[in-house]
Amino acid sequence: MRAALASALAVRPSEVVPWLRTRALQLIAQSGGSEARILGSVARGTDRPGSDIDLIVRLEPGRDIVDLLVLEEQLSDLFTFDVDVIADDSTGAVIEHARREAVPL
């Protein structure tokens, strides 16, 4: 009984994102962000209950790590899942791979 109830209450991040997309985009814009894209397990559709939400966001000039951290906190509160936000101007092989798999929020 307990396992069945827990299973019924388990929600994947990909099930929540469409419902909160508009508000998330508003928060991103208010933080100086645009062109938000999802990557990782949520983008691939392989997320599970407890998975986090990974985003790449283009930040306007003058925004810094503090703005990024505040945005992460706001989005985590909104989605009720951990959210990691990567600035689109990041460099390296990992971010290049992430850009290729990312899909629009």
Each predicted region: which residue ranges?
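Amphipathic, hydrophobic secondary-structure cores in small proteins
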Residues: 53-58
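Catalytic core of pol beta-like nucleotidyltransferases
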Residues: 1-35, 43-48, 59-105
